[in-house]
């Protein structure tokens, strides 16, 4: 995987307006794994792109009426077939974590990269998703080495509100695919 000015060369780019600059040009030091499906439990279609670009039609599905007002984004989405979609350059602050805290530090969006996996808490993720997540993570570690020691789920930084990536995410499998490091901590 190649990074070019914060973008993955291999990713389909769908620029989101929902981002801003990190404070004091802070480098990312945390990877947050999420899941998403729109409508819930359904895969494919244009809805995730539409949510992250602020163009989701609230009338297209009853669920969308409750989320159309949100201004949210992630850096990347990895679809079930392994396609990588990038919405925000990694050096910018995507709006994926919300109210959050990691190891006593609040406002995780300031110092994290958010990667969404198309899926649910209870359905197994695909081989292609694990392979692509590991490839992206290894590229990020090369650029932002602190990430090697700081990878977690949305459920761990916002436990009162979030459950993703859920029990269906196999952290041991992911860990085995990421470049070995003797000091890695992933929860």
From Swiss-Prot:
Name used for this protein in its record: 1,6-anhydro-N-acetylmuramyl-L-alanine amidase AmpD
NCBIfam families: PRK11789.1
Location of the active site: 116 (proton acceptor)
Family (UniProt): Belongs to the N-acetylmuramoyl-L-alanine amidase 2 family.
Known outcome of mutating residue 154 to A: Loss of activity
EC number, as in UniProt: 3.5.1.28
Record key words, sorted: Cell wall biogenesis/degradation, Cytoplasm, Hydrolase, Metal-binding, Zinc
Cellular compartment(s): Cytoplasm
Textual note on the cofactor: Zn(2+) is required for amidase activity.
Catalytic activity from the UniProt record: Hydrolyzes the link between N-acetylmuramoyl residues and L-amino acid residues in certain cell-wall glycopeptides
GO biological process: cell wall organization; peptidoglycan catabolic process; peptidoglycan turnover
Activity control, per UniProt: Amidase activity is inhibited by metal chelators such as EDTA, dipicolinic acid or 1,10-phenanthroline.
Residues engaged in binding Zn(2+): 34, 154, 164
Pfam families with a match to the protein in the record: Amidase_2
GO cellular component: cytoplasm
InterPro entries in UniProt: Amidase/PGRP_sf, Amidase_domain, NAMLAA_amidase_2
Cofactor(s) needed: Zn(2+)
GO molecular function: metal ion binding; N-acetylmuramoyl-L-alanine amidase activity
Domain N-acetylmuramoyl-L-alanine amidase: 30-167
Function description: Involved in cell wall peptidoglycan recycling. Specifically cleaves the amide bond between the lactyl group of N-acetylmuramic acid and the alpha-amino group of the L-alanine in degradation products containing an anhydro N-acetylmuramyl moiety. Is also involved in beta-lactamase induction.
């Amino acid at each position: 995987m190649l990074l070019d000015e914060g973008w993955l060369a291999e990713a389909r780019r769908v620029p989101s307006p929902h981002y801003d600059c990190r404070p004091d040009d802070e480098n990312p030091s945390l990877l947050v794994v999420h899941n998403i499906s729109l409508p819930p439990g359904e895969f494919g279609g244009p809805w995730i792109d539409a949510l992250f670009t602020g163009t989701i039609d609230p009338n297209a599905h009853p669920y969308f009426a409750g989320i159309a007002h949100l201004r949210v984004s992630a850096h990347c989405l990895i679809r079930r077939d392994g396609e990588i979609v990038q919405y925000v350059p990694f050096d910018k602050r995507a709006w994926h974590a919300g109210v959050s805290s990691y190891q006593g530090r609040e406002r995780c969006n300031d110092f994290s990269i958010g990667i969404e996996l198309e899926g649910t808490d209870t359905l197994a993720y695909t081989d292609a998703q694990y392979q692509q997540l590991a490839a992206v993570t290894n590229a990020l570690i090369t650029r932002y080495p602190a990430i090697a020691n700081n990878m977690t789920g949305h459920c761990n930084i916002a436990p009162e509100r979030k459950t993703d990536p859920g029990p269906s995410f196999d952290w041991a499998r992911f860990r085995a695919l990421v470049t070995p490091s003797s000091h890695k901590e992933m929860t």
